[in-house]
Amino acid sequence: SETEGNPGGSGSLHGFNYEFSRLYEPEMEDYSQSLLDNAEGFSETAIVVIGRVSGESNDSPKVQYKNCSGTGMPDEQYIDKTRTYLEISTEEEALLEYVGETYENVIVLINSTNVMELGFMETIPGLDSCLVVATTGSAGAKAIPGILYGDINPSGKLADTYAYDLSTSSTYVDTGTGNDTTNFY
């Protein structure tokens, strides 16, 4: 059934849950200097995991809903209409810029049920590698350390194209309901 947080209702072509699509990445100012110093002292390599979840009856919105309190549709101040759910957020971008400047090696893991825009891998200096791990499950999570240590070769063929900019796809314009906040892809 349709609710405030799930327009269109569960199973609807135009349904999703605002809570489910909300991004909870802290801002760089939220990390203490002590935490950042300890992490840098621990390793020359930073591993950053970018995650998104969407799919049947929980489509990806064309805006980003940020961390806030309450349920249902977030206040306007918590909606970033300049970025889609499948792009990195401003908070993730700041984190990636920080680790790109600070660490000798930076590995980005994409833990997403959908194809994300990966153009940031070319535009943010210092990002060395990117591995799409999809939704790992228990077997996939066990394989990641072997891949990172070089014991397992993750080569394979992708069935999807990972675009620099999803809006350049001809299908992007013709999906969803047609307004800026509930047009899904």
Give the predicted meaning of each segment.
Residues 1-185:
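C-terminal non-catalytic regions of proteins with extracellular/luminal or membrane-system context
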